[in-house]
From Swiss-Prot:
The lineage of its organism: Eukaryota, Metazoa, Chordata, Craniata, Vertebrata. It comes from the Eukaryota. It comes from Homo sapiens. Keywords: Lectin, Phosphoprotein, Repeat. Monomer. This is Galectin-4. Disulfide bonds: none annotated.
């Protein structure tokens, strides 16, 4: 079952190293680049480059380079005309060998803001115009789980969604009316419990994106699609880390229905990051985790358009939610 990203959300899952790919739509103010991965047990260094062009020796607008060398530090620099500029350094290491991490670059008008595992880490002022950046390069002692470009495609509030310029591997462009859509603005690092209002209700083809982290001691958390006026829950997703299950159910007229538990894989391990895409179809929800189909859940609330609230609570840290 092919995963087709919603416009404005361009993920690549399990990319191989070295990674060197164009940035969909180019770099723009307000764009975020999410990199989820695992640092090697024997990590010495890795780097992320925001590159001007695809040719060898191209300028590097921003070079981000963690180094485990006895003086654990992160180095920041710019390569222009074949020459490195003056280094900026931070003698602090936010990455742990063998541990999962989430690295976010937020592109702002004056600088790149770097966030690691939800914590602001550094701000690097632009030395080259950000509009010149065309490619992202990643390599070194790490394993990549996902790279997501978020906010690079302008979304139109009315009319059909825009065509994503770079379909993922094995994906072809879909008809406009079959593409998933995202309606609301993204929320970064929201607190838990989280309550989000689905403006206009839950419509067919609407996609909800949830990126988060399961703490090592986490026991369970829940994602609920609710009808605010009645308290009905059209879809209850409940990962339970203790027994490795992902329970789905509905609460209608005050009564829980029958649980569904079958999954092909479980992305909600303790100490793991996850990337969840929940799509509302005409007859079911389709749920993908880290780019792989996780489960379908047939609508039990036939008037699913009445769902107007997204609720997330429990043992989870959220890094990004878009409804």
């Amino acid at each position: 079952m092919a995963y087709v990203p919603a416009p404005g959300y361009q993920p690549t899952y399990n990319p191989t190293l070295p990674y060197y790919q164009p940035i969909p739509g180019g770099l723009n103010v307000g764009m975020s680049v999410y990199i989820q991965g695992v640092a090697s047990e024997h990590m010495k260094r890795f780097f992320v480059n925001f590159v001007v062009g695809q040719d060898p020796g191209s300028d590097v607008a921003f070079h981000f380079n963690p180094r485990f060398d006895g003086w654990d530090k992160v180095v920041f620099n710019t390569l222009q005309g074949g020459k490195w500029g003056s280094e900026e350094r931070k003698r602090s290491m936010p990455f742990k060998k063998g541990a999962a991490f989430e690295l976010v670059f937020i592109v702002l008008a004056e600088h790149y803001k770097v966030v690691v595992n939800g914590n602001p880490f550094y701000e690097y002022g632009h030395r080259l115009p950000l509009q010149m950046v065309t490619h992202l390069q990643v390599d070194g002692d790490l394993q990549l789980q996902s790279i997501n470009f978020i906010g690079g495609q302008p979304l139109r509030p009315q009319g059909p969604p825009m065509m994503p310029p770079y379909p993922g591997p094995g994906h072809c462009h879909q008809q406009l009316n079959s593409l998933p859509t995202m309606e609301g603005p993204p929320t970064f690092n929201p607190p838990v419990p989280y309550f989000g209002r689905l403006q206009g209700g839950l419509t067919a083809r609407r996609t909800i994106i949830i990126k988060g982290y399961v703490p090592p001691t986490g026991k369970s958390f829940a994602i609920n699609f609710k009808v605010g006026s009645s308290g009905d829950i059209a879809l209850h997703i409940n990962p339970r880390m203790g027994n490795g299950t992902v329970v789905r159910n509905s609460l209608l007229n005050g009564s829980w229905g029958s649980e569904e538990k079958k999954i092909t894989h479980n992305p909600f391990g303790p100490g793991q990051f996850f990337d969840l895409s929940i799509r509302c179809g005409l007859d079911r929800f389709k749920v993908y985790a880290n780019g792989q189909h996780l489960f379908d859940f047939a609508h039990r609330l036939s008037a699913f358009q009445r769902v107007d609230t997204l609720e997330i609570q429990g043992d989870v840290t959220l890094s990004y939610v878009q409804i």
